[in-house]
UniProtKB/Swiss-Prot annotation:
Keywords: Cell inner membrane, Cell membrane, Membrane, Protein transport, Translocation, Transmembrane, Transmembrane helix, Transport. One of its GO terms (molecular function) is proton motive force dependent protein transmembrane transporter activity. It comes from Helicobacter pylori (strain ATCC 700392 / 26695). The gene is tatC. Disulfide bonds: none annotated. The Tat system comprises two distinct complexes: a TatABC complex, containing multiple copies of TatA, TatB and TatC subunits, and a separate TatA complex, containing only TatA subunits. Substrates initially bind to the TatABC complex, which probably triggers association of the separate TatA complex to form the active translocon. Part of the twin-arginine translocation (Tat) system that transports large folded proteins containing a characteristic twin-arginine motif in their signal peptide across membranes. Together with TatB, TatC is part of a receptor directly interacting with Tat signal peptides. The keyword Transcription does not apply. This is Sec-independent protein translocase protein TatC.
Length: 253
């Protein structure tokens, strides 16, 4: 059994090494420009960030550089993921490789951009000013960056749902009917996932869950277009059965 899995494990190791190597190279490049990236990250917050420990500045630079490296490396990561999956697919299923890489990377960037320009400014402003009449908001640079990266990467991953639906529908694993049937269960799962990948506050979870519900609806439409239910065939079969029944009745008469 292990001998059968060995080639797959070796292939997985190869793809992981390429992905990790890409992230590492991107990290080194981003670390050189971490101050510029930090200014971009801080642009959504007009307040002052503080440093609570001597090592905090280094940790902030590492966090920012690593997060930026992941975003930059997404096309390569999707490409390596596809190269690992592709050998187990049929020839016609492999035709989705370019849409998978292109739309996978694109939807990740759209999710990150949606979080940066729409969600994050509102959430940070709300949380920073909540209770401002009782205490002063002194946000550390490290906690701010952690909050920012978790939200940005979380939305980037969440926006992959339509891409996943397209891929699964293309290989025939799901249909729009199956997604509709599990809709109420999906809502529960969506709120659980939102609670896991977002910072621990209700506002962030709601802002994550609502777009996910919309993306689930979009996934239903995508599955319907890619792998539609064979209604025409069913209607044709019903008509044929009716015609056969009528012919049999006439013959008996």
């Amino acid at each position: 059994m292990f001998e059968d899995l060995k080639p797959h494990l070796q292939e997985l190791r190869k793809r992981l090494m390429v992905s990790v190597g890409t992230i590492l190279v991107a990290f080194l490049g981003c670390f050189h420009f971490w101050k510029s990236i930090f200014e971009f990250v801080k642009n959504s917050y007009k307040g002052t960030l503080i440093q609570l420990s001597p090592i905090e500045g280094v940790m902030v630079a590492v966090k920012i550089s690593f997060s930026a490296a992941i975003v930059i490396s997404m096309p390569i990561i999707f490409w390596q993921l596809w190269l690992f999956i592709a050998p187990g697919l049929y020839k016609n299923e492999k035709k989705v490789i370019l849409p998978f890489v292109f739309f996978g990377s694109g939807m990740f960037l759209i999710g990150a951009a949606f979080s940066y320009y729409v969600v994050f400014p509102f959430i940070i402003e709300y949380l920073a000013t909540f209770g401002s009449d009782v205490f002063a908001a002194n946000i550390s640079a490290s906690s701010y960056v952690s909050f920012f990266t978790r939200l940005i990467l979380g939305f980037g991953v969440a926006f992959e749902l339509p891409v996943l639906a397209y891929f699964l529908a293309k290989v025939g694993l799901i249909t729009d009917a199956s997604l509709k049937a599990y809709f109420k269960y999906a809502i529960v799962v969506i709120f659980i996932v939102a609670a896991i990948i977002t910072p621990p506050d209700v506002v962030s979870q709601i802002f994550m869950a609502l777009p996910l519900v919309g993306l689930y609806g979009l996934s239903i439409l995508i599955a319907k277009m890619v792998n539609p239910a064979p209604k025409d065939n069913e209607n044709n079969n019903e008509n044929n059965n009716e015609n056969n029944t009528k012919e049999n009745t006439k013959s008996e008469s």
